[in-house]
Design a protein with these regions (language model features):
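Structured, hydrophobic secondary-structure cores that serve as assembly/anchoring elements
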Residues: 1-189
């Protein structure tokens, strides 16, 4: 038997998947032409490997798939812990920096401001909505510094898409016409 690390196949899968979509799980994380994994993992072992910053490969539902969308960031910011969010913000930042660098050294007049604003809104509109990169956005500030005139402030609030990871199921009911009720809650991690 030949055992090959899945990193190259996963990298190709990440490259071809929409940037805002995590390449993990049955639908988006399945690796083609792979027959199995070196060893099977339990749910608790998958969670432990993910908490260590590793991407566990799992053989479930007749398919080998990646089972994590985390980055190596271990702080409190959930966005920085999710690689699809980091990729989207990095892409948007690079596009805007390139665009604004091309517009550098133009006199910042009302006409220039309006033109730049329209082009930024047009770009952000093109990446907003389902099957795109962000859910919505708001330009909160686009103005010239009143004291240092060569400094322009641009504050954009974007709402990225986050992958569903934990499903919490709650059920309740009663037996026949009796008042005997029962409650149960399930949590999968």
């Amino acid at each position: 038997d030949l055992f090959v690390p899945p990193s190259a196949a996963l990298a190709g899968k990440i490259y071809k998947t929409l940037m805002s979509q995590v390449t993990a799980g049955k639908k988006f994380g399945g690796i083609n032409e792979v027959e199995g994994v070196r060893f099977d993992l339990k749910k608790s072992e998958i969670a432990n490997l993910e908490s260590l910053g590793l991407i566990p490969m799992v053989n479930e539902y007749g398919k080998v798939m990646a089972f994590s969308g985390k980055t190596l960031f271990n702080g409190d910011n959930l966005g920085l812990q999710t690689y699809s969010v980091v990729r989207v913000f990095d892409y948007v930042t690079k596009v805007l920096m390139d665009f604004l660098n091309r517009r550098a050294f133009e006199n910042f007049t009302a006409t220039t401001r309006k033109d730049i604003m329209n082009q930024i809104v047009q770009f952000l509109d093109s990446i907003t909505g389902p099957k795109n990169l962000i859910e919505n956005f708001e330009i909160r500030r686009f103005e010239q510094d009143p004291k240092q005139k060569d400094r322009i402030y641009l504050d954009i609030h974007m709402k990225p898409y986050f992958p569903a990871k934990n499903f919490l199921i709650k059920m309740d009911g009663h037996k026949g016409t009796d008042a005997n009720e029962w409650d149960t809650e399930y949590e999968q991690k």
